[in-house]
């Protein structure tokens, strides 16, 4: 199992531009994400996120599960067919409970379309990815703008990532964002 640990912040385009100016070159990735759940929302009820994302056109399927330490369990693989992605993810170690939960099928529930500017940051005691995401979240017939900054631990200790993210938040006056893209897009679908 992979473990995801990240801190997210709401940002303005001007704040993102200032961060980009400070840190130099970023890699640009076009993201088109569809989030899936069961018709009775069994995954969301258990705080499980299931998605297929096209990253510069390449299909990547991911499942994220709650983790006791505040991070999330994460399994990911390149996979084109959403109908068979749960089985494929379980084959690489995702909880087999997912097969039972999704036995009745999965449906698309919401999505996101955005551009990610990503950069690896070397920290004392580890590395992190600094990501600037700008685009839209979609649910039902509604959409809202997306503009956020993510700092994700890639290796090393949580503390180094937390320290870097906090200093970034102070310097650029960023506001913590405690809800995932999925949860915010899901709310749009529910309000429709």
Question: How would you label these PLM feature ranges?
Answer:
Residues 1-192:
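Phosphate-end processing signature that detects enzymes handling 5′-triphosphorylated RNA
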